[in-house]
């Protein structure tokens, strides 16, 4: 976008005038990462490292009831959780997971993260299809081409989840899911997103009425890659701010 002229060049004088605190707090090496052809185009998202592996927020109290005393720590644990919740609370819920047709991308990437040392090139590749490994970051490969046996196992697991009744039968065509809001009020058993969303869902806020209607309710989080310790911080340009070149 910067190359094609979509973003406004942010001069040092402009940043010092209109964003003085940001200018002072961002180190020079971070400004360098926000440059194209020597000009700054972005204000970085670098106030703190974001460890934002995606995963599932879930009812920790129900997981403990299912015998998972430490909560969900793997995809296998998650399957155990789903089976228990379906059998025990299925009639009280709208769905276990009111998923929609956009979730497949994060799901398969999460499976790969949990079952390999793959590290996607954040911010560059669509669908996290290309990256390196924790042992060899700079040799680029695609697990979609090399880890085919693992992906067959993932497909088998999704078939099992379908048979359990984890998601709606029209999941691939569903475009109107409000799963996160449904989790807040106790209508579903999980929400798939990342850790910053979990910090909201586990909080006793006015919108999270789940904790008012059930005093035992707790929300845990299983992040993709937890089994292997495969978690990385986001690039500081992931949520960086740019200004439209058409701004005046």
What annotation goes with each model-predicted range?
Residues 1-248:
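Extracytoplasmic/secretory soluble proteins
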């Amino acid at each position: 976008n910067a190359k094609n002229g979509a973003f406004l060049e942010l001069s040092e004088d402009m940043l010092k005038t209109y964003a003085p605190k940001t200018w002072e707090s961002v180190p020079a090496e971070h400004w360098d990462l926000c440059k194209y052809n020597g000009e700054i185009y972005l204000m970085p998202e670098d106030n703190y490292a974001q460890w934002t592996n995606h995963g599932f927020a879930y009812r920790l109290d129900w997981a403990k009831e299912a015998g998972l005393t430490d909560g969900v720590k793997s995809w296998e644990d998650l399957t155990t959780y789903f089976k228990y919740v379906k059998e025990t609370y299925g009639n009280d819920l709208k769905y276990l997971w009111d998923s929609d047709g956009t979730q497949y991308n994060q799901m398969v990437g999460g499976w790969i993260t949990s079952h390999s040392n793959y590290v996607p090139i954040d911010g560059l590749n669509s669908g996290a299809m290309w990256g390196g490994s924790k042992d060899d970051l700079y040799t680029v490969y695609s697990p979609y081409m090399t880890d085919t046996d693992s992906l067959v196992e993932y497909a088998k697991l999704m078939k099992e989840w379908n048979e359990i009744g984890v998601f709606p039968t029209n999941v691939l065509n569903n475009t109107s899911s409000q799963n996160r809001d449904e989790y807040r009020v106790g209508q579903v058993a999980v929400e798939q997103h990342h850790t910053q969303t979990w910090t909201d869902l586990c909080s006793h806020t006015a919108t999270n009425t789940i904790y008012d209607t059930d005093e035992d309710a707790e929300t845990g989080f299983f992040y993709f890659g937890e089994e292997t310790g495969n978690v990385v911080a986001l690039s500081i340009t992931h949520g960086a701010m740019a200004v439209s070149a058409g701004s005046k």
